[in-house]
Amino acid sequence: MPDPKLQSYIAAHYLSGPKADAILARASSSDIKVKRKKKKVKTDDASRVSSSSGLVFKDDSDTWKTPAEDDEDDGGLTPQVVDGADGQSLNKTFRKIGSASHGAKEAGTSDTASMSTPTPAPTSVEEPTEFKAGLRTRDEMKAARLAREERKKREAASLSVDVSMASSTPAANDDDDQEARLAQQTVYRDSSGRIIDLNAQQAEQERLERLRLEKQAERNTWSQGLVQKQQRQQAAAQLAAVQQQGIARRATDNEYNEYFKQQQRVDDPAMAFLTKKRSAGPSMPKYKGGWPPNRFNIPPGYRWDGVDRGNGYEKAFFERKAQLETRELQARAWGQSDM
């Protein structure tokens, strides 16, 4: 039979509708019922007669006189006795009848029996486990933490012992291990039977790869002009010099002022009367005068007599280039004339 209290709780919190209303109505009506009082069993004449002799007469047919427990009191559940004394259940059912002296004697014998029986030893406390599922109290968490710290200390101690034992071994063991490792290495040979050293071969391949990368980087700079290369070198030298200079720049910085004085600008109005700088060191003579243009803008030597001894390719190249530019300008002008 299901528990009516459980049914009423489920109906109140989880159900709805006529079924829930019926369950709640039945539960409320059952709560109004008045509990029946338990009647005490009257002692019969036989028990009064036997009180003088100290004997107990009990008939199985008299159990109907004891009122049954109401089902509403405990919901149909029978109480379970977990850790009671051996004679407690018998004392509830049977009642001893006799003189007070007889009861005192029995009490004395029971005391002596309890003193003679050895007290059970207390159960050993379980060691706190480091890991435990479910909810834990503060004491259990503290015990788990202490157990974890103790385990770490034991592991550290065992590791230190192993290291000390390994360090105390003689050097002969290292030699034996080295020989064993060398014996286990694979030996590679070529077609002629010569041993191939893989480490040396790998080092040679790395050296060749470095040389290839260096040549590739040098080959990439071939298409660049000498002026750009000189500018990069000057920038690198300037960065190296700046690393040793201070951050602050003042008006009295001679090097900073000299750098700006050496700069020449085409639109400078003082270029007409300023003295020209002379490059330090000897300079080669140059051709003075005009010369026909070429693709690389290379000037002629200072001994050139002004006669063009080429095959005429440079002249035809620039004429064709000028024609294409003129045609493009005319086409653009004709397309925009009506705008």
Swiss-Prot record:
Protein role: Involved in pre-mRNA splicing.
Biased-composition ranges for Low complexity?
109-124
Q: Which UniProt keywords apply?
A: Coiled coil, Cytoplasm, mRNA processing, mRNA splicing, Nucleus, Spliceosome
**Region Disordered: start and end of each range?**
34-195
Protein name in the entry = Pre-mRNA-splicing factor CWC26
InterPro entries, from UniProt?
Bud13, CWC26_splicing_factor
Q: How would you summarize the oligomeric state and partners of this protein?
A: Associated with the spliceosome.
Q: What residue ranges carry the coiled-coil annotation?
A: 197-222
- Compositionally skewed regions (Basic and acidic residues) per UniProt: 136-156
A single Gene Ontology CC annotation of this entry is: U2-type spliceosomal complex
Cysteines engaged in disulfide bonds, as pairs = none
**Compartment(s) where it occurs, according to its Swiss-Prot or TrEMBL record:** Cytoplasm; Nucleus
Q: Which Pfam families match?
A: Bud13 (PF09736)
Q: What is its main location?
A: cytoplasm
What lineage does the source organism belong to? Eukaryota, Fungi, Dikarya, Basidiomycota, Ustilaginomycotina
Source organism superkingdom: Eukaryota
What gene is behind this protein?
CWC26
User: Which GO biological process categories is it annotated with?
Assistant: mRNA splicing, via spliceosome
Q: Which family does it belong to?
A: Belongs to the CWC26 family.
